[in-house]
């Protein structure tokens, strides 16, 4: 289910503080965060946020069409290595 409109988007406070600090200092380094559940706001456009995927921080450059989505949608947690080939097909 979608979040209620009267509640507004959810963003962790520590992430908002980091974004405000970067905007004030014009720093170009990625903002490192573990908050995959935070919603992308229009304030984030043009920033690079390194989102944790369980193993590493994946840098995500925020563009205008990402607004309203969650940060975790752009940092994949699973790597697909393909299905195993059938053993019968290998023998022939």
Curated annotation (Swiss-Prot):
Superkingdom, taxonomy of origin: Bacteria
Gene Ontology MF terms: rRNA binding; structural constituent of ribosome
A Gene Ontology cellular-component term: cytoplasm
Spans traversing the lipid bilayer: none
Role noted for this protein: Protein S19 forms a complex with S13 that binds strongly to the 16S ribosomal RNA.
UniProt-recorded name of the protein: Small ribosomal subunit protein uS19
Keyword Protein transport found: no
Residues of the signal peptide: none
UniProt record, GO biological process: ribosomal small subunit assembly; translation
Family: Belongs to the universal ribosomal protein uS19 family.
Coiled coil: none
Keywords attached to this entry: Ribonucleoprotein, Ribosomal protein, RNA-binding, rRNA-binding
């Amino acid at each position: 289910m979608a979040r209620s409109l009267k509640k507004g988007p959810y963003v962790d406070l520590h992430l908002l503080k980091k974004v405000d600090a970067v905007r004030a200092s014009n720093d170009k380094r990625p903002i490192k965060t573990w908050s995959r559940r935070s919603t992308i706001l229009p304030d984030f456009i043009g920033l690079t946020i390194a989102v944790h995927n369980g193993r590493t921080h994946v840098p995500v450059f925020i563009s205008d069409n990402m607004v309203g989505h969650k940060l975790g949608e752009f940092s994949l947690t699973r790597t697909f290595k393909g299905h195993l080939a059938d053993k019968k097909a290998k023998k022939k």
